[in-house]
Regions:
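Intrinsically disordered, low-complexity, charge-rich terminal extensions
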Residues: 1-299
Length: 299
């Protein structure tokens, strides 16, 4: 259950619901499969395989999951059936089929096929960190992260959460660290970065598995480019890519965390419990340290 990418939202800790209230509210928005002519269905589902509950609590961390099921109806299938219908009318009735009638036939075919269409499903997990006051979403895509936040707000009747907004931008800090050749505190430069320039056609430079202190890399900053993604290692526990919109990508949890979780987990439930606490504590502590180097939160 180790999150590989993260979007996060600072929360108002004083206005978080009680665990029992959260579970009850999510149960009122529980996932149900697509029915009849529904194109998709969305709702909260059990976040772990070994429990039917909609919230998996591990101390001060609460794991939830939003499940989405979508009908899969390829446009080519509809088009082939439509072509057959049009040809049948032309042959049997000796007339052409107009645009409006074709559209009506297409809608009828779609309605006939939808109840029998295959489905695909996806899940987005999120953790309420009630100690540090963060909602951690296991997705760096803004649309996915905003969607589960919206669904939580709808289910709870409101949730005070905001996009991370620091006094200094992540891009500015990353550019400064790359230019000076080292980071602050518990952070170290890793081996990947992305830089962007300015202009009508924005030049993009991607650096992978290289020494980021090398002259040819630093020269890009001296030439006016800014860092939009930067590979970092935090306290020999987590390696990740920090982005300009303050999301974390390609997260790797180094051996010390994995081994500690395994030493505390004898079965699936206890391993998930330990992993959830260790991951959340490490990520949230790291985020707080990053925020401090970004000048703190905007008022």
């Amino acid at each position: 259950m180790w999150f590989k990418q993260i979007s996060f939202y600072p929360l108002n800790k004083d206005k978080l619901p009680e665990l029992e209230v959260l579970a009850d509210k999510l149960a009122q928005s529980e996932f149900a499969h697509c029915q009849g002519l529904d194109w998709f269905s969305e709702g909260f589902a059990t976040p772990v395989s070994f429990s039917p509950e909609l919230v998996f609590p591990a101390d001060y961390t609460w794991l939830v999951a939003l499940k989405k099921e979508e009908k899969v109806l390829p446009a080519g299938v509809i088009r082939d059936i439509l072509d057959e219908k049009v040809l049948e009318i032309q042959n049997n009735e000796a007339r052409n089929v107009g645009r409006k009638e074709k559209q009506e036939l297409k809608e009828q075919i779609t309605d006939d096929l939808l109840p029998r269409a295959f489905t695909r499903s996806s899940r987005t997990q999120a953790i309420f960190d009630t100690r540090h006051g963060y909602l951690l979403v296991n997705n760096a895509a803004s649309a996915k992260a905003e969607n589960i936040l919206t669904k939580l707000r709808e289910a709870l009747g409101g949730l005070e959460a905001a996009l991370p907004n620091t006094k200094q931008s992540p891009s500015s800090l990353m550019t400064s660290w790359l230019l000076q050749g080292h980071c602050e505190g518990g952070f170290e430069l890793d081996s990947d970065c992305e830089l962007k320039g300015v202009g009508d056609v924005v030049p993009v430079v991607k650096v992978s598995k290289q020494d980021l202190t090398a002259d040819e890399v630093v020269q890009h900053v001296k030439n006016g480019k800014t860092v939009t993604q930067l590979g970092l290692v935090w306290r020999e526990q987590i390696a990740f890519i920090l982005t300009q919109d303050f999301t974390l990508k390609r997260i790797q949890y180094l051996d010390v965390l994995q081994e500690e979780a395994e030493s505390n987990g004898d079965d699936a439930a206890s391993l998930a419990f330990a992993s959830q606490i260790l991951m959340t504590e490490a990520i949230s502590t790291m985020l707080e340290e990053l925020v401090s180097y970004l000048g703190g939160w905007q008022e």
